[in-house]
Design a protein with these regions (language model features):
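Glycine-rich beta-alpha junction loops
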Residues: 15-17, 46-48, 61-64, 74-79, ...
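Generic structural signal for well-ordered, non-membrane alpha-helical segments
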Residues: 18, 46, 50, 76-83, ...
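Glycine/threonine-rich helix-loop capping motifs at alpha-helix boundaries
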Residues: 21-36, 58-71, 75-102, 150-153, ...
Length: 221
């Protein structure tokens, strides 16, 4: 355009206009991914602190686009009302209280599961951007080994999504909208290209020629 010089690749997050621009130039220029509104899922067992869970859910709702997705998957049914009470209490003095309430009304889903195996199934289907495992230490390995579709796993009661976003170290440009089923977050490999190197000598060519001929005949070349 008159404003921007042509580039080979565009990376990084942005608003809906940035995403649509990246979508339209894909194929002419490379892109990393199309990260949409932020998402968090919290898997909680009976050891989880309702105050921590509430804080994690509220922190997600504070992102500000109005389209955030918040998922709570819990094994202890007695905790749900306590978590609700914690949410109500913690948002009282927040400046974005009305927006947070709207997001909880439109973008919050809580699911009670009978065990952690069911929690794994839910997580692998939703494929959330951030997945907090607020469970006993001895349950972390099972979840970590069996959940295959999450942009980032935050392990244990003290690994808040905000830490992953700001200071933990790994990229927080992560796939959303279930796209972690087939993609990963922005990483150093996104700034590299790979070229295949092929070299035969006379002897290796002779060994391979018959196989190459068979493929050629199969394709009627």
């Amino acid at each position: 355009t008159k404003t921007f010089k042509k580039v080979d690749k565009i990376v990084g997050p942005g608003n809906a206009f940035v995403n649509e621009s990246k979508r339209q130039v894909f194929g002419v220029a490379g892109i990393d991914l199309l990260p949409g509104p932020s998402e968090v899922m919290v898997i909680a067992d009976e050891s989880a602190d309702p105050a921590f869970i509430a804080a994690a859910l509220i922190a997600q709702a504070e992102h500000g686009s109005g389209k955030e997705k918040i998922y709570l998957v819990f094994t202890d049914s007695s905790q749900f009302e306590i978590i609700n009470s914690e949410i109500s209490m913690q948002i009282q003095d927040l400046s974005h209280r009305d927006l947070i309430l709207e997001i909880f009304q439109k973008g919050f889903l809580a699911t009670h599961v009978r065990n952690l195996e069911e929690a794994v199934s839910v997580a692998n289907f939703v494929a959330p951007e951030h997945l907090e495992l607020q469970v006993k230490d001895e349950n972390i390995s099972f979840l970590q080994n069996n959940i295959k579709t999450a942009g980032a796993l935050l392990l244990g009661h003290y690994s808040a999504t905000a830490l992953g976003d700001f200071i933990a170290g790994p990229s927080h440009v992560l796939p959303t909208g279930r796209s972690s089923r087939f993609s990963s977050g922005l990483r150093i490999e996104d700034f590299f290209r790979r070229t295949s190197i092929i070299r035969y000598d006379k002897e290796s060519l002779q060994k391979a020629s018959q196989s190459a001929l068979l493929f050629s005949e199969m394709e009627k070349l």
